């Protein structure tokens, strides 16, 4: 039974009902409907911390989905899972793939910046200042791109850029 049919969460149930209605009303192919169902089930599993199940659903959605814009969100969510699992290199790969298909994803730039900043902090702890500066510079580049797309967001990042004279 698909995850969307066994949700106990009121919000997930409501989302599922609305999504099902939209899928019936909006003219889409069976393949697109299946891709969306897997994507929706992936989001549900991800929100419950069931990352392995979420990844299975996202990979199946990727197999079916042909629209680059829709694929970008699937790839972005796969990146989120890898970030949560501490697999930062993999996460960045997926964020970059998402951005190739949809360059207007400020959240992907932000997440890559957060990873780079974290890696910079790790290098500081190891007293490797050259490496830390390289990571911080990369974080700054990603944050600048995120801010360019969403100027009213990422205030903390904007302050960090100003305080470190990277803006």
From Swiss-Prot:
Topology of this chain in the membrane: Peripheral membrane protein
Keywords for the protein's UniProt record, in alphabetical order: Chloroplast, Membrane, Photosynthesis, Plastid, Repeat, Thylakoid, TPR repeat
Family to which the UniProt record says this protein belongs: Belongs to the Ycf3 family.
Main location: plastid
Role, per record: Essential for the assembly of the photosystem I (PSI) complex. May act as a chaperone-like factor to guide the assembly of the PSI subunits.
Organism domain of life: Eukaryota
Protein name: Photosystem I assembly protein Ycf3
Stored InterPro entries: PSI_Ycf3_assembly, TPR-like_helical_dom_sf, TPR_rpt, Ycf3/AcsC/BcsC/TPR_MFPF
A GO biological process held by the record: photosynthesis
GO terms under cellular component: chloroplast thylakoid membrane
TPR repeats: 35-68, 72-105, 120-153
Record-annotated membrane-spanning stretches: none
A Pfam short name: TPR_1
Localization (cell): Plastid, Chloroplast thylakoid membrane
């Amino acid at each position: 039974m698909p995850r969307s049919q066994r949700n106990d969460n009121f919000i997930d149930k409501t989302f599922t009902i609305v999504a099902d209605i939209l899928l019936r009303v909006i003219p889409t192919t069976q393949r697109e409907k299946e891709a969306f169902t897997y994507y929706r089930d992936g989001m549900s599993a991800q929100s419950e911390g069931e990352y392995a199940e979420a990844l299975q659903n996202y990979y199946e959605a990727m197999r079916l989905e042909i629209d680059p814009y829709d694929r970008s969100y699937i790839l972005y969510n796969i990146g989120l899972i890898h970030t949560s699992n501490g697999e930062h290199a993999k996460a960045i790969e997926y964020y970059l793939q998402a951005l190739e298909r949809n360059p207007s994803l400020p959240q992907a730039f932000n997440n890559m910046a957060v990873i780079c900043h974290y890696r910079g902090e790790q290098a500081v702890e190891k007293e490797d200042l050259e490496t830390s500066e390289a990571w911080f510079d990369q974080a700054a580049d990603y944050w600048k791109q995120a801010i360019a797309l969403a100027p009213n967001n990422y205030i903390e990042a904007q302050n960090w850029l100003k305080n470190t004279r990277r803006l």
